[in-house]
Design a protein with these regions (language model features):
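Active-site loop-to-helix junction immediately N-terminal to the catalytic Tyr of the SDR YXXXK motif
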Residues: 165-173, 185, 213
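Catalytic Tyr-X3-Lys loop
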Residues: 109-137, 155, 179, 234
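Residue(s) in the substrate-gating loop at a strand-loop-helix junction
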Residues: 159
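Short, small/polar-rich loop/turn modules that mediate ligand/substrate recognition or access, typified
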Residues: 151, 191, 196, 258-260
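Canonical Rossmann dinucleotide-binding motif of NAD(H)/NADP(H)-dependent dehydrogenases/reductases
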Residues: 5-39
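C-terminal substrate-recognition "lid" of short-chain dehydrogenase/reductases
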Residues: 236-266, 271
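Conserved mid-core segment of classical short-chain dehydrogenase/reductases
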Residues: 73, 96-126, 145, 168-171
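Active-site helix of classical SDR
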Residues: 140, 175
């Protein structure tokens, strides 16, 4: 991996939830290259283990259900046994659910045969809020307790749709807004303990999961891509590597030691664009 710059995290231990995924997996690799001990937590142990193996001897994979406090406590104990303490926590677990996703942007009186707002399922809403907000709450409760005595750094993953809710995903947009608010609350609450808390708010990035929504099989952009880029002043999608600089800056006490309570968009200007 080519880092935009390198910070020295030797002797620091970072716990990353959702580390088997695309974005947080790359985060873990970058942190490992900077010398950190990295604990990769994911309910998909095989995915996390594969990335841990790439990082090397300073990384371990741990199966963790971020909605089960006993599972989180067990994961925390494993990290402490391996590395002694946790200095940085990255709450990266999250996602959406089709049961909380509309088919269309707008509701019309004569709309029929589509999944509109009234067809959204309560179970989908609860799933999305649990996966994004409750997981961050539970993991922080367990992992930050040790930081109260030692100081620490918490980085949450929000989204640009916390600023501008995306039209078809009300639950996910609201959940990420909750993450942004929770980030600010934690920053104030933990300030006397020398614990900083910030969030990164990614914009649109091309990943294996969404590539089929953004590009046709022949490589041409879909209509959705056209709408996204029209609302992105930089007129391009982000690359996962674009997030690494922000991550490393927030991880460095020397570079961002007076920064807490911020939610930083990395979105090519999407959250700033009004369209008029």
């Amino acid at each position: 991996m080519k880092l935009p710059f390198e910070i020295d995290l030797t002797g620091k231990t970072v716990a990353v939830t959702g580390a088997g995924g695309i974005i947080c997996g790359e985060f873990a690799k970058a942190l490992g290259e900077c010398g950190a001990n990295v604990a990769l937590l994911d309910i998909n142990y095989d995915a996390a283990e594969k990335i841990a193996d790439e990082i090397g001897e300073n990384a371990i994979a741990i199966r963790c259900n971020c909605l089960d406090k006993e599972s989180i406590k067990s994961a925390y104990s494993t990290v402490i046994e391996a590395f002694g303490q946790v200095d940085i926590l990255i709450n990266g677990a999250g996602g959406n659910n089709p049961k909380a996703t509309c088919d269309n942007e707008y509701m019309f009186p004569d709309t029929a045969g589509v999944k509109d707002f009234f067809a959204l399922e309560e179970s989908g809403l609860k799933f999305v809020f649990d996966l994004n907000v409750t997981s961050a709450f539970l993991v922080t409760q367990v992992f930050a307790e040790g930081m109260v005595k030692t100081g620490g750094n918490i980085i949450n993953i929000s989204s640009m749709n916390a600023y501008r809710p995306l039209t078809k995903i009300p639950a996910y947009s609201a959940a990420k807004a909750g993450i942004s608010n929770f980030t600010q609350w934690l920053a104030v609450h933990f300030a006397p303990c020398n614990i900083r808390c910030n969030a990164i708010a990614p914009g649109f990035f091309v990943t294996n999961q969404n590539r089929g929504l953004l590009y046709n099989e022949d490589g041409t952009p879909t209509a959705r891509t056209g709408k996204i880029l029209a609302a992105t002043p930089m007129k391009k999608f982000g690359e996962i590597s674009d997030l690494i600089g922000c991550l490393l800056w927030l991880c460095s006490d020397e570079a961002s030691g007076f920064v807490t309570g911020t939610v930083i968009p990395v979105d090519g200007g999407f959250s700033a664009y009004s369209g008029v």
